Amino acid sequence: MSFSPLIRQLIDALRTLPGVGQKTAQRMALQLLERDRSGGTRLAQALSQAMEGVGHCRQCRTLTEDDLCPQCADTRRDDTLLCVVEGPMDVYAVEQTGFRGRYFVLKGHLSPLDGLGPEAIGIPQLMARIEEAGTFTEVILATNPTVEGEATAHYIAQLLQNKGLIASRIAHGVPLGGELELVDGGTLAHSFAGRKPISL
């Protein structure tokens, strides 16, 4: 089926979303145009407003509409703990744990093959943030448990060691409520390597 130029443009725009392929984009476009034009208009307005009004927090670099995000503006948070994550979605995930420290959001992870070095992901800004604050005693490296995430955490840990700060890594392994037979070998090996004694 051949679509008109405007429909084709809408389909191509929808395909920029993660996980949306050609067929899904076509279904979405036709749904909005045939059955939910008011929803399509709301979507277009919300997207336009977000693209214009949402920027980055000047301290932690997460997404926000204000100069400081709610976490950085909160004076009741623990100024001795800094949690470093790969992206804004990670901040929301860590917040669900009850973490009450501060954040710094990298722009991804080190990936030399993709041309992403320390400068590209914001490691110099991270080090400047640590220096400027002067209150952090521990930096929690909560990068993803991938080869690139581990390399990024290791690189940052080396920089922090030179400054006399504690660098810790979030634990990885068997998920709470998970069954061993369903866990992949790499995850299980990581769990065994990071085992801890049971405190009674």
Curated annotation (Swiss-Prot):
The keyword Metal-binding applies. Residues 80-175 form the Toprim domain. GO terms for biological process: DNA recombination; DNA repair. It holds the Pfam family Toprim_4. The keyword Cytoplasm does not apply. Keywords: DNA damage, DNA recombination, DNA repair, Metal-binding, Zinc, Zinc-finger. A zinc finger (C4-type) spans 57-72. It comes from the Bacteria. One of its GO terms (molecular function) is zinc ion binding. PANTHER family: RECOMBINATION PROTEIN RECR (PTHR30446:SF0). May play a role in DNA repair. It seems to be involved in an RecBC-independent recombinational process of DNA repair. It may act with RecF and RecO. HAMAP family: RecR. Belongs to the RecR family. This is Recombination protein RecR. The lineage of its organism: Bacteria, Pseudomonadati, Pseudomonadota, Gammaproteobacteria, Pseudomonadales. The gene is recR.
